[in-house]
């Protein structure tokens, strides 16, 4: 089996690329970073530090790389069995024209073996969005052929890959946590379902997308916002603070109650999942900075994201939400000189006051009880 993976950054090399190579798939990375491309083609291998209770170093081998903006990448799309991405949501649109060209070439060459494309991004139904961009870039006479022979498979991904703080100057070395989760929508594949260790197949992807958003992302953000307020440097420092831990765990339990109601998750299994996530936040090898995790507070306070969406679920089912409110209030206090959204948030609160500002950012009714609860909590933190 041959695969092409767009994005040879830390997540591409440390997570998806590693799983594919470990499964014995012939893997080519596509990227624009010439230093990384040259290193991959010189060595055909790289090291991944996998850190949990202990640290182990795995070597990923048998890989090569091409530029994502040249002809080579188009040729490969005409030949491979699987295309994956880890480029960031914004970049999906930029790689779509190359994918479209490759699909046209595949059709011209008469290659009718199934191709599956999986975007592995921190977003909901990212592959469906990529498909829209690819379809827009295709000539009309290729669209029906692509619909018939190419699967666009949505996925949910979860692995903490912090920015490399390695003392070496090796452009390929990467650190990842032991935990990883790659869940794909098995209803969207063309041809036989792949058997790749570390890839889980489901016919209910949205349940797992929300489970991650409402647990890992909610907990991570609240840990960062409360941690910043308490002058902690890292996520580990923050979660070891008992006061913060109680609120974070409480918020994940509140959002979890929504998931259990909505999707029928088993309550005991979900409690174990929350414990596992608290353990991930404590990982001593992950120097995860609270400022990095907290950045873009406007996005994180928007209606469909990790703080407001679970809160809306608690309102829908009439469930408690005291800790989620604490997290939202802490997010409103987030300040960072390096983050334009943090500055915009501060300006909005200064201009309109916390009540109107939160309503504008989150879409919540300014006169609602929850907004007033959040404003009370916000003022209590000043």
From Swiss-Prot:
Superkingdom assignment: Bacteria
SUPFAM superfamilies recorded: 6-phosphogluconate dehydrogenase C-terminal domain-like, NAD(P)-binding Rossmann-fold domains
Statement: the UniProt record of this protein carries the keyword Chloroplast: no
Post-translational modification N6-acetyllysine, affected residues: 269
GO molecular function per UniProt: mannitol-1-phosphate 5-dehydrogenase activity
Cellular-component GO terms for this entry: cytosol
EC number: 1.1.1.17
Reaction(s) catalysed by this chain's protein: D-mannitol 1-phosphate + NAD(+) = beta-D-fructose 6-phosphate + NADH + H(+)
EC supergroup of this enzyme: oxidoreductase
Alphabetical list of PROSITE patterns matching this protein: MANNITOL_DHGENASE
The protein, known as: Mannitol-1-phosphate 5-dehydrogenase
